[in-house]
Amino acid sequence: MSDLTFMSKFKPETRCIKEFKYWIVCIRAKCSTLGDAVILLKRETPTVAGILPEEAAEFPEVVKWYEDTCTKKFGAVKFNYVIMMMKDFFVHYHAFPRYDKEVEMFETTWKDKDWPGAVDFVGGTILDEDKLMEIKDYMKE
């Protein structure tokens, strides 16, 4: 892993689910839905316009892996992506798998309370680190 100090808030050293050449996918601590993640550009740039062509070219591969994983592992039926960068001034996407029914996993009943409307990405439950690692490890399998 290269120097990712600028994104330390998202703890990539412990929360990385999958690393690509230009992007890293990390489990999101504040969960609105099962499998929430943050997709981070591994190079610090303050605007989406700053994404290089080769980084942009890899992004669909990252999203495909993420969507396939969440669909296969959790039964996700749709996905929402949010890019705001209001507090963290580097390119990253918040990714939310969406569910049309409850999912029982990890000793928890996960309900997508906003289905079929827009996900509440500001709310959510902050999971303890053990639960996050359990979900992350399951997604990595």
Give residue spans per PLM region:
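HIT superfamily nucleotide-processing domains
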Residues: M1-E141
